[in-house]
Swiss-Prot record:
Known cofactor(s): FMN
Listed name of the protein: Putative dihydroorotate dehydrogenase A (fumarate)
Cofactor binding notes: Binds 1 FMN per subunit.
Residues binding FMN, per UniProt: 45-46, 128, 165, 193, 220, 248-249, 270-271
GO MF term set: dihydroorotate dehydrogenase (fumarate) activity
Positions of the catalytic residues: 131 (nucleophile)
Enzymatic class: oxidoreductase
C-alpha cells in the first residue's frame, strides 16, 4: 500500500499536503474546512500581537501564471488562533496543527512566544520571518545578523516545537550563511518559501493591486523553480533534525513529487488552494500516489532528497 504519511519533529501526519499560511486560514470556519479535507494538517493565518485589517483592497489577483498579493498580514490576532488550536487539541480527535505567528518587532515576537509557552498548546509553531507585504517592515530573514540574534534570544526561553517560514534566497553564499545560522538552533523545520517579494503584474497599462503601487508577492507557477532550489539547497545544508516544508508552485501531484524529491517532508499549497478550495488536497494526493506507484515507491522516504544530477 502506497503511503504519503510523513513526520515533522515528533509529530506524525497521515499525508504530506497542507495549506500555506495566508490561504484558507483566516477564520475558524476556513480552518475547519481544511481540517475536514484530505490535508494532513492546517497552518493558521500568521497571527500578530493585535488584530490587523491588512492593506487596502484590491490586494490579491489571480494571474495567468499564478497570483500577486500584498495582503499586509490581515489577521484576527494570535490569541484567536492560539485559543482555536488549543481547543482542538483538547478534544483529542484532531490532527497536529501549525500555529503561524510573528511580531512586528522583536519585543512583540517575544511577547507572543512567551504567551504560547505559558499556554496549553503543545503543537508546532511557525514563526514567519518572511512577509514581504508589510509597509515599512523588511523581511527579517534577509538580515542574517538580526535573524541570528532573534533566534538566539528565542531559544533562551522557548522550548516547544518551533520552525521558521523563510523568504526565497537566490545566492549560493546566502544558502551557506543562512544554513550555518539555522543549524545552531533546535528548529523543528524550515518552510521554503514565502512568495517572491515585490513583483509587478500589469494588465492594460495598469497594475493589478492597490498597495505599494502594485508591488506584491508572486506565487504559483512563477515561483516553483525558486522554491525547489531553496528546498534542495537547505536539504543539503541543514542537520537532519531540521525538516523541510516545501511551498511554492504546487498545483499537481507532480509538483508535490518534485518538492519531496528535492528534500521536503511536507508540502504546502497556496495559490491553487485559493482558486480551487480544499478539494485540491484529494486530487493532488491521488496524483502523487499514482506517480509513486508508477515509479515503484511505497513511501516518501523511498525518494525524498534523491534528486539526481547530470554526470
Amino acid at each position: 500500500m502506497v503511503s504519503t504519511a510523513t513526520q515533522i519533529g515528533h509529530f506524525s501526519f497521515d499525508n504530506c499536503l497542507m495549506n500555506a499560511a495566508g490561504v484558507y486560514c483566516m477564520t475558524k470556519e476556513e480552518l475547519m474546512e481544511v481540517e475536514k479535507s484530505q490535508a494532513a494538517s492546517f497552518v493558521t493565518k500568521t497571527g500578530t500581537l493585535e488584530v490587523r485589517p491588512g492593506n487596502p483592497e484590491p490586494r490579491y489577483a489571480d494571474t495567468r501564471l499564478g497570483s500577486i498579493n500584498s495582503m499586509g498580514l490581515p489577521n484576527n490576532g494570535f490569541r484567536y488562533y492560539l485559543d482555536f488550536v488549543s481547543d482542538l487539541a483538547k478534544t483529542g480527535q484532531h490532527k497536529p496543527h501549525f500555529l503561524s505567528v510573528v511580531g512586528l518587532s522583536p519585543t512583540e515576537t517575544e511577547t507572543i512566544l512567551k504567551a504560547i509557552m505559558a499556554s496549553d498548546y503543545e503543537g508546532l509553531v511557525e514563526l514567519n520571518l518572511s512577509c514581504p507585504n508589510v509597509p515599512g517592515k523588511p523581511q527579517i530573514a534577509y538580515d542574517f545578523e538580526t535573524t541570528d540574534q532573534l533566534l538566539e534570544n528565542i531559544f533562551t526561553y522557548y522550548t516547544k516545537p518551533l520552525g521558521i517560514k523563510l523568504p526565497p534566497y537566490f545566492d549560493i553564499v546566502h544558502f551557506d550563511q543562512a544554513a550555518a545560522i539555522f543549524n545552531k538552533y533546535p528548529l523543528s523545520f524550515v518552510n521554503c518559501v514565502n512568495s517572491i517579494g515585490n513583483g509587478l503584474v500589469i494588465e492594460d497599462e495598469q497594475v493589478l493591486i492597490k498597495p505599494k503601487n502594485g508591488f506584491g508577492g508572486i506565487g504559483g507557477d512563477y515561483i516553483k523553480p525558486t522554491a525547489l532550489a531553496n528546498v534542495h539547497a537547505f536539504y543539503k545544508r541543514l542537520k537532519p533534525s531540521i525538516h523541510i516544508i516545501g511551498t511554492g508552485g504546487v498545483k499537481t501531484g507532480r509538483d508535490a513529487f518534485e518538492h519531496i524529491l528535492c528534500g521536503a517532508s511536507m508540502v504546502q499549497i497556496g495559490t491553487v488552494l485559493h482558486q480551487e478550495g480544499p478539494a485540491i488536497f484529494e486530487r493532488v494526493t491521488k496524483e502523487l500516489k499514482t506517480i509513486m506507484v508508477e515509479k515503484g515507491y511505497q513511501r516518501l522516504a523511498d525518494f525524498r532528497g534523491n534528486l539526481r544530477y547530470k554526470d
